[in-house]
């Protein structure tokens, strides 16, 4: 079951209309401080469920237990940005605030982008990595690689290793190069993991 999400769209810069979408958890469940409940003589059971829902509870002994006294502060809402074709990563600066993951195209390395010129309106790995680093986004997933970058190094003059090397030169967070059918999970701890393949 998916949590409630807030979705926002940001127009990107490309030859045709392209958009980025940010997905932010709208409601983050607060955790009960069970040690404090036990220490206060509140036995586990239906009362805990009511407190978890933010409702005060009248105990059989006549005490009123206030939910706010036993709920830990909520964790930070998780936020993911998924962008389409875009030659200006900085258009996402407003959305990148507090983002946990940025998924963005990195079609070329800087060298190939300079050789091709601005016409195709795509980003280089360095452009995206510099942006993600400046925005303090802890997880970056690069996508939409030009076919000139072969999947296996040594089979041609360019490989995905070139994209990865360029990105790592500008970005110190968790970096992934997405492959077709990859699935990622963002844990409640903010750690991005490659999910078990289908």
Predicted features by range, described:
Residues 1-82, 86-94, 101-103:
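Active-site-proximal loop/helix segment associated with metal-binding centers of metalloenzymes
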Residues 88-198:
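Binuclear metal-ion centers of metallo-dependent hydrolases, dominated by the metallo-beta-lactamase
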């Amino acid at each position: 079951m998916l949590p409630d999400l807030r979705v926002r769209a940001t127009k990107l810069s490309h030859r045709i209309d392209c958009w980025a979408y940010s997905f932010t958890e709208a409601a983050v469940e607060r955790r009960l401080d069970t040690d404090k409940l036990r220490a206060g003589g509140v036995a586990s059971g239906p009362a805990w469920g009511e407190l978890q829902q933010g409702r005060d509870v009248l105990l059989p002994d006549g005490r009123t237990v206030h939910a706010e006294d036993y709920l830990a502060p909520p964790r930070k809402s998780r936020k993911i940005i998924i962008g389409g074709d875009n030659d200006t990563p900085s258009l996402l600066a407003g959305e990148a605030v507090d983002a946990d993951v940025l998924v963005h195209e990195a079609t070329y390395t800087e060298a190939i982008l300079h050789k091709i010129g601005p016409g195709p309106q795509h980003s280089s790995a360095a452009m995206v990595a510099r942006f993600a680093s400046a925005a303090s986004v802890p997880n970056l997933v690069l996508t939409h690689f030009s076919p000139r970058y072969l999947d296996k190094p040594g089979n041609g003059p360019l490989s995905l290793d070139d994209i990865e090397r360029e990105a790592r030169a500008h970005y110190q967070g968790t970096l992934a190069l997405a492959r077709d059918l990859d699935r990622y999970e963002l844990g409640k701890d903010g750690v991005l993991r490659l999910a078990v393949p289908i």
